[in-house]
Amino acid sequence: MTMQVDPSANSSAASSAAPGTTVDRAEIEKFSKLSQEWWDPTGKMAPLHRINPLRLQFIRDAACRKFDRNARSLNCLAGLRLLDIGCGAGLLCEPFTRLGAQVIGVDPSASNIAAAKLHAEKAHLSIDYRCTTVEDMDVRERFDIILAMEVVEHVADVGLFLDRCAAMLKPGGMMAASTLNRNWKSFALGIVAAEYVLRWLPRGTHQWDKFVTPDELARHFERNGLGITEQSGVVYSPFGDRWSLSSDMDVNYMVVAEAVG
């Protein structure tokens, strides 16, 4: 079988988004179809389960440094309001709730939110899940920590999305985001390898031209008075079959942004 993949085939040209919105309906439909698979560590969400401990560690440690907490404490985030935007079925909401945070998880997919509520109920966790979008939230709500993990490459308007996120951040708060860099290496590894060769992800999960470079992300933050204070790449090693944090941000990467000045 001949495999042909072109970056232009992974284009957002056919985006089903209306002007002035962050919502891409095609993206919502794509992830809604996976709603029953979010919590299966061996299913289509397996890659997310593999990197989830690294995401949790990166955000927890940054938050503990920011808010002067002991990262070894089981309740290290007690008293902090955390908003997880594009929460899916709650893979980050649940561990952060266990760390003591008051967690609000939002997702535009009703089926994702239903799966999240059901799993939280079975785990006896109290999490405020809402089927909504960032632009439909009340901007008067304020949060100590806002997460946008593996989300910005799926929204229709990255600038508008981050503007709305920043508007809900408390003074002295922090925002964490993760996405994929945009270059030929990320196309080769993030799309060709992950979706076509290794088949870690369903084909069409990502669109290469919607990946966001660290410089682009930094400019969006700067426009909102935020600066990147921490950053890390997330890399896979076939030797040992494991993911780890790295200074290599060519493909997957995470950042923390805080108010500057």
UniProtKB/Swiss-Prot annotation:
Keyword terms: Methyltransferase, S-adenosyl-L-methionine, Transferase, Ubiquinone biosynthesis
Source organism of this protein record: Nitrobacter winogradskyi (strain ATCC 25391 / DSM 10237 / CIP 104748 / NCIMB 11846 / Nb-255)
Entry protein name: Ubiquinone biosynthesis O-methyltransferase
E.C. number: 2.1.1.222, 2.1.1.64
A biological process from GO: methylation
Coiled coil: none
Gene3D superfamilies noted in UniProt: Vaccinia Virus protein VP39
Catalytic activity reported: a 3-demethylubiquinol + S-adenosyl-L-methionine = a ubiquinol + S-adenosyl-L-homocysteine + H(+); a 3-(all-trans-polyprenyl)benzene-1,2-diol + S-adenosyl-L-methionine = a 2-methoxy-6-(all-trans-polyprenyl)phenol + S-adenosyl-L-homocysteine + H(+)
Homology family: Belongs to the methyltransferase superfamily. UbiG/COQ3 family.
InterPro entries: SAM-dependent_MTases_sf (IPR029063), UbiG_MeTrfase (IPR010233)
Top enzyme class: transferase
Pfam families listed in its UniProt record: Methyltransf_23
Pathway involvement of the protein, from the record: Cofactor biosynthesis; ubiquinone biosynthesis
Bias kind Low complexity: ranges: 8-18
Entry binding sites for S-adenosyl-L-methionine: R55, G86, D107, M149
CDD domains (UniProt xref): AdoMet_MTases
Region (Disordered), start-end ranges: 1-22
PANTHER family listed in its UniProt record: METHYLTRANSFERASE, UBIQUINONE BIOSYNTHESIS O-METHYLTRANSFERASE, MITOCHONDRIAL
Role, per record: O-methyltransferase that catalyzes the 2 O-methylation steps in the ubiquinone biosynthetic pathway.
Molecular function per GO: 2-polyprenyl-6-hydroxyphenol methylase activity; 3-demethylubiquinol 3-O-methyltransferase activity; polyprenyldihydroxybenzoate methyltransferase activity
